[in-house]
């Protein structure tokens, strides 16, 4: 076990919506442990200023069948129920017939080196508890929604730039969360970096409250949707024969981001991370990156063939990084 000054910080996610896909399977690890793994896609629909948005929230799922004491893991049993009994839109076809679900989990880090040697990093949702709910439950729990409640340390606050390189009025928050249970091991990866957009209507209040190095709790929407195409997004009329209206290619902009919708004032009176803890957190993060890079093996360059050897997907290596969301004490 490693000696540490770090303390775990709040990291919870609540996703409420319709089950769109269930992609779970039973498997066995290299050392013979039975498990269940895969993902569940939850459709979260909302209206923002009259604009309909449909978010596909992919929730990662993993559990070994047995705990260390030899008893069956309750999470495994729950995920089996999801796999065998939950009705998804993909299965039943009719959205209204698919199950409503409340997923509770956490935000984690998905990080790997791609085939061309580029390091790629993003946040994803890791599911823990799945519960089928009713329409009334959705209303009581203020859904549909996909919201992360994260306590984090601010690493930078910068202007968001538009397509012409000018400030858009939004801010980009970069920070990190610390997520672990029990004691840290030497090979632990407890640091969860995150990047989030602060919309223009909150940007001034946020920047007036926070400085680099501050610790606070942030409520963030998890967004993954396609923007509706405007007239400017439609390409020139296609050439062809007969009636060609509606055959134009339409460009769509896909939005995949965390969006800060509120937060507390910066922590004080010992609740905040101090300089020593921040320095240690950076060391843990450095070790995680070194481990990732040392484990990278360049793959052979694939051909342009659509089949055979050229069709192999990227070999990736992932780094993995709970209670109800508490939004009652948000200050902006």
PLM region spans:
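OB-fold (S1/OB) nucleic-acid-binding surfaces
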Residues: 31-81, 129, 159-198
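Short nucleic-acid-contacting surface segments enriched for D/E, G, S/T with interspersed K/R
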Residues: 69-103, 199-219
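A general secondary-structure signal for short beta-strands and their flanking turns/coil
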Residues: 10-12, 33-39, 54, 98-100, ...
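OB-fold and OB-like beta-barrel modules that bind single-stranded nucleic acids
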Residues: 12-21, 96-109, 152-154, 211-226
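Acidic, gly/ser/pro-rich intrinsically disordered tails
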Residues: 1-9, 26-30, 132-332
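Extracellular-facing segments of soluble proteins and assemblies that are Gly/Ser/Thr-biased and enriched
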Residues: 99-148
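Hydrophobic, proline/glycine-rich low-complexity stretches
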Residues: 1-28, 32, 36-38, 62-67
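Catalytic micro-motifs at enzyme active sites that drive phosphoryl/nucleotidyl and oxygen chemistry
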Residues: 2-4, 27-30, 87-96, 110-119
């Amino acid at each position: 076990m490693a000696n540490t000054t770090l303390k775990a910080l709040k990291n919870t996610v609540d996703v409420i919506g319709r089950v769109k896909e269930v992609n779970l399977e039973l498997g066995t690890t290299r050392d013979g442990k039975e498990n269940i793994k895969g993902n569940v896609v939850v459709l979260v629909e909302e209206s923002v200023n009259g604009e309909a948005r449909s978010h596909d929230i992919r929730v990662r799922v993993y559990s070994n069948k047995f705990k260390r004491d030899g008893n069956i893991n309750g999470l495994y049993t729950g995920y089996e129920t999801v796999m065998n009994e939950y009705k998804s839109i993909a299965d039943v076809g009719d959205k209204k017939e698919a199950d409503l679900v409340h997923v509770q989990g956490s935000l984690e880090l998905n990080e790997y080196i791609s085939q061309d040697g580029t390091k790629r990093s993003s946040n994803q949702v890791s599911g823990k508890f799945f519960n089928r709910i009713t329409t009334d439950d959705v209303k009581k729990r203020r859904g549909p929604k996909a919201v992360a409640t994260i306590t984090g340390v601010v690493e930078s606050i910068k202007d968001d730039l538009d397509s012409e390189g000018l400030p858009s009025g939004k801010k980009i928050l970069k920070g990190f969360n610390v997520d672990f249970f029990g004691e840290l091991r030497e090979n632990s990866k407890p640091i969860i970096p995150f990047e989030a957009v602060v919309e223009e209507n909150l940007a001034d209040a946020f920047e007036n409250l926070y400085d680099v190095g501050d610790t606070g709790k942030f409520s963030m929407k998890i967004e993954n949707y396609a923007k509706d195409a405007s007239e400017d997004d439609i390409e020139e009329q296609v050439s062809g024969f007969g009636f060609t209206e509606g055959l134009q290619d339409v460009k769509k902009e896909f939005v995949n981001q965390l969006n800060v919708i509120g937060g507390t004032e910066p922590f004080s009176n010992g609740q905040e991370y101090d300089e020593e803890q921040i320095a240690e957190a950076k060391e843990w993060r450095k070790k995680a990156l070194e481990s990732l890079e040392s484990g990278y093996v360049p793959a052979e360059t694939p051909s342009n063939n659509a089949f055979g050897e050229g069709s192999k997907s990227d070999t990736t290596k992932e780094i993995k990084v709970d209670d109800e969301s508490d939004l009652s004490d948000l200050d902006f």
